[in-house]
Structure formats: structure tokens, C-alpha cells
Amino acid sequence: MSTFNSNFKLGTYLTQVRQENPLVHAITNYVTMNDCANITLAAGASPAMCESRDEVSDFVPLAKALYINIGTINQEHKDSIYLAAEKASELEIPIVLDPVGAVAIKSRLDLVKDLLTNYNVSCIKGNNAEIKCLAGRKGHGKGMDSLDLGEDIQMVNSELSEKYNTMVLATGKTDLITKGNITVKVSNGTPLLGRITGSGCMLGILISAFIGASDNDWEAGIAATVSMGVVGEMAEESISSSTDLGSFRVKIFDHMAALTSKELQERGNVSEL
């Protein structure tokens, strides 16, 4: 059973990432691959975008975490994902799974369910619509974006967490993170994160980095989620207008690189539901 310690030190997990410099093996999408690599570096971890089916089985053992994102899936990606997931599960390397577009495309939904059923996934991270879709609810999606209000998302999170024995993160206006019978709400962030492509993918690989550096997946996942929200807030504070989206995107990397454990601790807004 998971427990939530309201006094846990968010900043400890950022410090661990920077001390351990975990290697994150990412099989991710082409749209946001560069953003994922840069946010990982800014946080203090090391990314590797190794996706060839001829290489992944040899590369996974070198990593501390595996991040799977199906945003631009193709057959070679599928082959590589299965090989990587098998090796990671064999070696007990944590897997973070981002079911991008599963709400809109049945073949993606089938792939994600198969991975969850057959491999040891440490965390599922998706928007409200994707998470509800995985649980068999009707989610409303427009392409890769969520249009779902997620009124019952806490219950859905709990069902998925217990079914697949994994941590579940549903992102939205507030982010809900569930493991077993415990759900916490992260209230950091800004609507501007939803106006640039890649913010969700960056969060997914950050979770991978934080989990890869820690023995406590639960608290590390929470800390990673807070980190992304906090640097989003800082980036918004650094621009002159809400239309400065290019500057906002760059500022995310700047503030992640400069983020201190003290700032993360002081600005984190986490509560148990």
C-alpha cells in the first residue's frame, strides 16, 4: 500500500537527479524529441534517443529508466518498444508509458493495453481523456489533445493503478497522481503549458529521470510533476505577454536548469485527496 508523507522533501529528488545523472532511454516521438532531450539535460539527467530495433536490447541495460511515448508510432517503433519493454522488465528498470493519442486511435489503445498487461510499467502518464479511455470510459480527444473535463478522474486513476499495479498520472488544470488507494493533487503549472507542443512529453521524460535516480518511485514522480509545473510558472513570470510562446518555451529550459531544491520545495503545491 502506498502512503503519502505530506512533509516529504520535494527538493531532495531534484538533488538526486543532479547527483546521480541517470541515463534515460527514450523511445519517443519526432515532434518533441529535441524538447525531451533538452529538458532532461536541464534537469541534470542524460537522455538517449536510441530507437533502432537492432540496438535497444543492448542499450536498455545501460539506462536507469525507459520512457516510451507513442506520439509518432510506426512499425519499427513498435518492434523497438516491445524489445525494450521486455528487457527493462527483465532487469527491473522502471518504465514510464505515455499513451499519446490512444483516445483517438484504436491501434494505439490496443498497443498500450498490451504493454500494461505484459510488462512492468512503473508509471502511466496521460491527459484526462487518455487515462479515461484506458479505463474503458468515454474520453473526448481532438487529435493528441484532451478536451475532457475529467470530473471522475480520481476514481479512474485508482482503478487503473490497482488493475496494472502502477502509478497513474492524469494531467489537466490540476494533475492527479495515484498509486493504489492514495491520490495527490499537484496544483502547480500554468495554462500556457497547454499552448505549446511538448509540455506533456517533457513531463513524461522528467518523471523517468526522477524515478531513475530514486528508490521511491511514488515521491519521485510527484516531485517531477511539481518541477514541471514550477518551471512553467517561472517561465510565465519571465515573459512580457501571454502571446510570447516562443520565449516561454525557451524559458522553461532556462528555469529548469537554474531551479534549486529550495525553490522547488517552497513553490510546490501538493495535497492529498
UniProtKB/Swiss-Prot annotation:
GO BP term, pick one: thiamine biosynthetic process
Chain positions recorded as ATP binding sites: 125, 171
Reactions the enzyme catalyzes: 5-(2-hydroxyethyl)-4-methylthiazole + ATP = 4-methyl-5-(2-phosphooxyethyl)-thiazole + ADP + H(+)
Binding annotation for substrate: 49, 198
Enzyme Commission number(s) from the entry: 2.7.1.50
Co-factor requirement: Mg(2+)
Family in the record: Belongs to the Thz kinase family.
Full protein name: Hydroxyethylthiazole kinase
Source organism of this protein record: Natranaerobius thermophilus (strain ATCC BAA-1301 / DSM 18059 / JW/NM-WN-LF)
